[in-house]
Amino acid sequence: MTVHDRIEINSKVMLGKPVIRGTRIPVELIVRKMGEGADEKALLQAYPTLTPQDIHAALRYVADSLGHEEVVLSVAE
């Protein structure tokens, strides 16, 4: 199963935000919680429908999204 098999974007689910397929758990929530210090074990306990593979897919999805994003930096004068 690939990242894209686990991540779903549907305008009728969470206003079209990327979620773990078959859930209403946004990718953003997973990444935000991890950024706040939650580890995989804590996420799996808090969201029993998640699997370790779902968490890894969410992280890869964000990395892929950022990898294809253009960043424009302004030069300080």
Model-derived segments and spans:
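Acidic-residue sensor for enzyme active/binding pockets
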Residues: E8, E28, E40, E69-E70
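Short, charged, surface-exposed hinge/linker loops at domain edges
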Residues: Q53-E77
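Basic, low-complexity segments
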Residues: M1-M14
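Short, surface-exposed, charge-dense and proline/glycine-enriched linear segments
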Residues: T2-D5, K33, L50, V71-E77
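Amphipathic, hydrophobic secondary-structure cores in small proteins
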Residues: L15, V19-I20, R24-Y61
